[in-house]
Amino acid sequence: MTQFVGAIDQGTTSSRFIVFDRHGAILAVAQKEHRQIYPRPGWVEHDPLEILANTQEVIGAALARANLTAADLAAVGITNQRETSLLWDRETGRPLCNALVWMDTRTDELVQRYRRDGGQDRFRDRTGLPLATYFSALKLRWILDNVDGARAQAESGRALFGTIDSWLAWNLTGGPDGGVHLTDVTNASRTMLMDLATCRWDDDLLATFGIPRACLPRIVASSDLHGTIRTPPLDGARLAGILGDQQAALVGQACFAPGEAKNTYGTGSFLLMNTGTEPVRSKAGLLTTLAYRFGDEPPRYALEGAIAITGALVQWLRDNLGLFDSAPEIEALARSVPDNGDVYIVPAFSGLYAPYWDDSARGVIAGLTRFSNRGHIARAALEATAYQLCDVVAAMEADSGIRLATLKTDGGMVANELLMQFQADMLGAPVVRPRITETTALGAAYAAGLAVGYWSGTQELRDNWGVDATWRPTMPAELRAHHQRSWKKAIGKSLGWIDRPQAAADDVG
């Protein structure tokens, strides 16, 4: 009897497999981290074969812990780190190079060249996205231009392009022996190659970026029967859901009505608001993106505020500065001081994303005195997450005309109660943590389960959602205003830090 649904959650730092029951409760979970590869400053890579091996390992471990087999699963869904891009040989299954991670900035020179003719928003009307190092099109262009033989193989169709969802789906459904090469609308919308209105690859964009159509995956719905898994230990299970991680969290938080929003605190942070069946064009620095598409229903769209570095700042304090041994320890260190000591951190390690979109911004620690100590640095790091989200919320309210009444949250950092209270204080609005915080994986499970009738519809998914904790604002308005002014001053020190060389004369489009 197929009593459960499985979800592969392939993230920036680790791969997980989670088994959910009909109420969205977790039956079993297994997780394994993969290496972060930094060949040069600004370059970030992952080994696709390591990710694939880890994914298969955690699937087996989770099933074993629950004493289950593939036959016990009604369906399996995939959710993944978005934009991270790779090219692989369809005959051997070997990647042509490491995957270029979403936060990798090596395409900065290409971005500047394309901006010369039409500016940062040159393609925004069609794609919903500004020209930035974040998105997949120029990552693929870089691979085609810099990896030996890549362009010829891509043009012939021997090399296949994909984000991580495509890579996993292709391998799970057979790989070189008939694996399906596809991606869902949410992941496709992050490539800068898809027309938002049609949900199809756009020939003009392909020509402009120099991308051969032969290497691209087929674009499919987020919730549908995509294929049968043909590799152990899920051999025979149905692959029926694919969602980019932030869209998956939107689904997992049951944000199915226009105006409903969630924020995920992870390596970066991502605020998404459902805008319904029509895309809303941002005038305040947000992204217009796909929210999801269930079967033959019209696609749903979202506004997104993407923040590159939040949880990654905590990792940096741990790994590069050695302020603590494990990430959760930052809360105790931050609580060792009563306030931030007027220290502010702008973690622009990969430039600044929404609403600034400045690839030349760099990280800043401002306000240091001899009084400043480790506790102040830790507290400022947590507060930086809240300040960045407030910037995005202000932009989203300006675009949507909707005042955020309550913030639904998820992701690893929601366990940090000091951060959650400070977030409520800075927003001036309640912050809510749901009972089930693994909403990214849950969203992928929901998409898969809906496709096979395991759940009857979105109302049943709404009924699964419930509140675990709520934080309400208590900060005096004068202190909030002081923090806002100081944060804006620190942002000003970060913007435009890199002096750009004169762009090359050759025209790329």
From Swiss-Prot:
Coiled-coil spans in chain: none
Protein name in the entry: Glycerol kinase
UniProt activity-regulation remark: Inhibited by fructose 1,6-bisphosphate (FBP).
Pathway the protein contributes to: Polyol metabolism; glycerol degradation via glycerol kinase pathway; sn-glycerol 3-phosphate from glycerol: step 1/1
Source organism: Rhizorhabdus wittichii (strain DSM 6014 / CCUG 31198 / JCM 15750 / NBRC 105917 / EY 4224 / RW1)
Reactions this protein catalyses: glycerol + ATP = sn-glycerol 3-phosphate + ADP + H(+)
Its EC number(s): 2.7.1.30
Binding site for ATP: 12-14, 267, 311, 315, 412
EC top class named in words: transferase
UniProt keyword terms in alphabetical order: ATP-binding, Glycerol metabolism, Kinase, Nucleotide-binding, Transferase
Any single biological process term in GO: glycerol catabolic process
GO MF annotation, one: ATP binding
Family: Belongs to the FGGY kinase family.
Chain sites annotated for binding glycerol: 82-83, 134, 245-246
InterPro entries: ATPase_NBD (IPR043129), Carb_kinase_FGGY (IPR000577), Carb_kinase_FGGY_CS (IPR018483), FGGY_C (IPR018485), FGGY_N (IPR018484), Glycerol_kin (IPR005999)
NCBIfam families xref list: glycerol_kin, PRK00047.1
HAMAP family linked: Glycerol_kin (MF_00186)
Pfam families named in the record: FGGY_C, FGGY_N
Binding site for sn-glycerol 3-phosphate: 12, 82-83, 134, 245
Domain of life the protein comes from: Bacteria
